[in-house]
Swiss-Prot record:
This is Spermidine/putrescine import ATP-binding protein PotA. PROSITE patterns: ABC_TRANSPORTER_1 (PS00211), ABC_TRANSPORTER_2 (PS50893), POTA (PS51305). SMART domains: AAA (SM00382). Its main location: membrane. Belongs to the ABC transporter superfamily. Spermidine/putrescine importer (TC 3.A.1.11.1) family. The complex is composed of two ATP-binding proteins (PotA), two transmembrane proteins (PotB and PotC) and a solute-binding protein (PotD). It is a peripheral membrane protein. One of its GO terms (molecular function) is ABC-type putrescine transporter activity. Residues 10-240 form the ABC transporter domain. Keywords: ATP-binding, Cell inner membrane, Cell membrane, Membrane, Nucleotide-binding, Translocase, Transport.
Amino acid sequence: MEKLEQKTIVELRNVTKSYGDKTILKDLNLTINDGEFLTILGPSGCGKTTALRLIAGFEDLTEGSIILDGQDVSNVSAEKRPVNTVFQSYALFPHMTIFENVAFGLRMQKVPNEQITPRVMEALRMVRLEDRAEQKPAQLSGGQQQRIAIARAVVNKPKVLLLDESLSALDYKLRKEMQNELKALQRQLGITFIFVTHDQEEALTMSDRIIVMNAGKVAQDGTPREIYEEPKNLFVARFIGEINVFDATVIERIDARNVKANVEGRICHIKVEDMQVVPNQKLKVLLRPEDIVIEELDEDQSSKAIIGHIIDRNYKGMTLESSVKLDHNGMNVLVSEFFNEDDPHIDHSVGQKVALTWHEGWEVVLNDEDC
C-alpha cells in the first residue's frame, strides 16, 4: 500500500531569536505535520519554550519566518493565528464557572450565542467533564483543571494546539493518567499537538515524533523508538534515559557492517553499519543498562568479559539496578535486570565480582568526535 504524503501544518524556516547579544535559537528549521503529536524535548535553556512562543506569536522573530497552514504568519499577531496554547498554570478564571471559562474565547470572537452552548458542551464532553459545567475551578482537582484548560483551547477549533510543560504541576500518578488522556484526545480531535517538556518519559509515552534540542539547535529528530534506541550523538543518548559509554578501539573489519574491537578489554564484534572505520580508530560504544548481562564470578575466576565489582544495588520493584565499578579503570557501569525473587543469581551482593557482557548488535557505536 502506497504511503500517503503528509501535509505540513507548521514550518520554521531559518528561525533565529536573540535577546540583546544573547542568541537563544540559531537558524532553526523545523517541519511539523498535520495531525501529529510532536514533542520538543530538552533541558532548561535549550530554546524549546522560545520556539513554542514564537509559533504562538508571543515573541517576535529576530530572523527567519514561520509558516502556518501555508500562510506566512511571521508578522501576524498572536490572537489572529490559528493556534491555541495551554500553559503550565492552566490560567483559568477563578470567578467564572467552568462553562464560562470554556466559552470565554468564543465570546471574545463574537460567536453567536446560539452556537456557544453546543460548542462548549461538546468540548466538555471530549474531556469528560460536561457534568461540571456550573462549578468553579477551585472545586476541581488538578487533573480536571488541566482538562478544562484543554477544552477551552480546543473549543475554538485551532489548527494547532501548543502545550507548554502542561503536566509538570501534577503529581506522578495523575501525570501518568493525563499522558494517556492527552494522546487519546489528540487522536480524537485529529489536530496537531506541539508539546514542550523536559521530561523524557512524557516525550517517549505520548509522541509520534520527538525533537531533541540542545543549545538552541536540533540535536535529533525522530520517533520515540529512534531517539531511545538509535541516538545520533552522546548528548541525546545521555539525555534520554540512562546509558553507559565505553571506550573502544577497532582491531579489524569483519564485514560491511561489523568490526572486531577492544571494548574496555573485551574483544568482541560491534556493528558499525555504514561508518568509515580503520584499525586502531577510537570509537564509543553505548549500551543501555537493560542491555547488559551480568554474571557472578568467584574472586579467583577469570573471564574474557569486562570485569568489575558491585558497589551498590537499588530495588525498583520490577527491576534491580546494580552499580558496577570496573576493575581496570574505576568506571561505574549501571546494569538493570528484571527482578525475580526466585532466581538466586539476580539478587547480587555488594562486593560481588561480576562479568559484564551484552548481546552483540544491541550496542550503539559513535565516532569518538561525535561525543
